[in-house]
């Protein structure tokens, strides 16, 4: 059996923090931010929690998939900014979506959270352990952002995304390529009750080297040329 995405959903807060407004909080301007990051605005969760955003995205994904919450037998939540140490975010999602038959666990993998969750869902489905998995990624990065640190505050915002992955005989998620470099863990950190601290140059160097390598590995696994990729 294959793991196939059958529905997606997302949620972004209403409040928009533009580059112009951000320039009143820290020494920067719209041109500086856009030329370096391509970012012109970010969404901020003024009221509500990480789980609130997650539930909104989850309900949209269930509706898009055309299934009931009771059909879900596993919920994987990916977040690095949970509201509680416990209960975990996935259990709160279960409660507020009515997914009473689901096993729940969380993943903390920062930017890689969705890929890690999708990889886990794929493995569980292909092993025959679960048939319908709800993946929800939700982050409230504004809560751990130093709004006086120009190197980080321009980058992050809040929001949530979700998808439903189902066991199917049809073509599904083809390949996953995962790696970890714990030796570089100190270049991007957020200690408990502290804000994000980032060595931007080291993060950039790692990303521009390793992401293309991973993409090429996946293309080789599937005997596919880069020119064949549509999006």
Regions found by a protein language model. Give the residues of each.
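Acidic, glycine-rich active-site loops and adjacent beta-strand->loop/helix elements
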Residues: 11, 78-83, 109-114, 137-142, ...
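Buried hydrophobic packing segments
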Residues: 54-61, 117-121, 214-215
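Condensing-enzyme catalytic core mediating Claisen C-C bond formation in acyl metabolism
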Residues: 1-47, 149-209, 213-217
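Conserved catalytic cysteine-centered active-site region
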Residues: 34-36, 40-52, 80-133
